[in-house]
């Protein structure tokens, strides 16, 4: 198997899942390089000087290009490989503008709420830190208000930018998936009690590219917990070949 020029440095946070999801929608071969973000591996001098001076993941390397920030990575992949795999960018300028608008909504309205809940309910417990119950309750209430707006929008079209799945939808699923995997039934009810939102989430969760992403994400979690290889894939990722060496995983999408 030839070495892939494309590398994705990633770890256990939702922006990494969005980048993985996008690559899998495109069906691109790449090397996944595990970075234990929670253990500070993104803060080393080498990482800061060669990959991302802000010490965050994901980071994409494609030839001589290095990109950080999830939306910059997915936008590049969607444009550079527009004719490969799933088209994630509407061709119509107005629809593309609507897509961009909902990506901004994600950044400014949805993600700050979701990230706080993920931090309090998943990351803090993993690190042995206390959960701020007040912050959790406040952000559940904020999430309910935001999801009411999404429910209205998704009653007008099956996806945020219109009739087709796009980057706007892609970026929402990763944090939603984290929220659905907490022990908070109230969070699940906030999503599934809204029929349009629920249908949107379930359609995205059944996409083959997302099913691959979940398997990869689970193995990132295994790496984080166990820090040992080799990794053995289960049958749900049968369309991808994974070869692991140290913290690097070469992915061939077929």
From Swiss-Prot:
Residues 92-231 form the GST C-terminal domain. It catalyses: RX + glutathione = an S-substituted glutathione + a halide anion + H(+). Its EC number is 2.5.1.18. PROSITE patterns: GST_CTER (PS50405), GST_NTER (PS50404). Residues 4-85 form the GST N-terminal domain. GO terms for molecular function: glutathione transferase activity. This is Glutathione S-transferase F14. It comes from Arabidopsis thaliana (Mouse-ear cress). The gene is GSTF14.
